[in-house]
Swiss-Prot record:
BP GO terms, sorted: beta-lactam antibiotic catabolic process; response to antibiotic
Organism of derivation: Klebsiella pneumoniae
PANTHER family cross-referenced by the UniProt entry: BETA-LACTAMASE (PTHR35333), BETA-LACTAMASE-TYPE TRANSPEPTIDASE FOLD CONTAINING PROTEIN (PTHR35333:SF3)
Name of the protein this chain belongs to: Beta-lactamase SHV-6
Catalysed reactions, as listed in the record: a beta-lactam + H2O = a substituted beta-amino acid
Keywords: Antibiotic resistance, Disulfide bond, Hydrolase, Signal
Broad EC category: hydrolase
Cystine connections: C63-C109
Signal peptide: 1-11
Active site positions, chain numbering: S56 (acyl-ester intermediate), E154 (proton acceptor)
Family in the record: Belongs to the class-A beta-lactamase family.
Length: 260
């Protein structure tokens, strides 16, 4: 689903019918928004104001908060953080290799976004004041919907009706646009955040697998329990980031391959 839906919607004269069909086939709930990056205009929306689990897509916002602290002079990407074995959680492919020497803040952000390293995310989350601190950052930049209440890996539980660690497609798209185009971050930090998304190494089975030659993509995926799956992406033809696409899926019995 997540691989084919954006391009199918883009090409379809009836994009909402395409989304409804996908939702029916998966027997779950799909939330999607396609937004013009330059203007912020909504191009396509389906369940865009309904809550969905963020899963690992929150890591982009987290690193945006870290970069805001860097811009303010309160953090440095070169600062080394040391941690212990007991700080590691499931799926930490990068951080587990650096117990002896630690990792810099910049390296942790790269690991969190490009490899979805969960321990890296938790270590970064601690630097911004935990889940409550990240939620406060979101409120400061005008996102009154998105909320983080838990750490990795509990935040991926995706319980029905649970508002914890959720967002809406519309809110996530608007927040991404603010981080990447407004003055919330310096131009240098915007370029860095976008580059980490360009360098994503765990999104191969999704949109990247069907993208036409010459298209730009920068993305971050997420996976959770109870059929939850998600992706946030910037993409466009002629190797230019023209639009933001956010897709979330929940409450489906579909396999991971089918969700992808």
């Amino acid at each position: 689903l997540l691989a084919t839906l954006p391009l199918a919607v883009h090409a379809s004269p009836q994009p909402l019918e395409q989304i409804k069909l996908s939702e029916s086939q998966l027997s779950g709930r799909v939330g999607m928004i396609e937004m013009d990056l330059a203007s912020g205009r909504t191009l396509t929306a389906w369940r865009a104001d309904e809550r969905f689990p963020m899963m690992s897509t929150f890591k982009v916002v987290l690193c945006g908060a870290v970069l805001a602290r860097v811009d303010a002079g309160d953090e440095q990407l070169e600062r080394k953080i040391h941690y212990r074995q007991q700080d590691l959680v499931d799926y930490s492919p990068v951080s587990e290799k650096h117990l002896a020497d630690g990792m810099t803040v910049g390296e942790l952000c790269a690991a969190a976004i490009t490899m979805s390293d969960n321990s890296a995310a938790n270590l970064l989350l601690a630097t911004v004041g935990g889940p409550a601190g990240l939620t406060a950052f979101l409120r400061q930049i005008g996102d009154n919907v998105t909320r983080l209440d838990r750490w990795e890996t509990e935040l991926n539980e995706a319980l029905p009706g649970d508002a914890r660690a959720t967002t809406t497609p519309a809110s996530m798209a608007a927040t991404l646009r603010k981080l990447l185009t407004s003055q919330r971050l310096s131009a240098r930090s915007q370029r860095q955040l976008l580059q980490w998304m360009v360098d994503d190494r765990v999104a191969g089975p999704l949109i990247r697998s069907v993208l036409p030659a010459g298209w730009f993509i920068a993305d971050k995926t997420g996976a959770g329990e109870r059929g939850a799956r998600g992706i946030v992406a910037l993409l466009g033809p002629n190797n230019k980031a023209e639009r933001i696409v956010v897709i979330y899926l929940r409450d489906t019995p579909a396999s991971m391959a089918e969700r992808n």
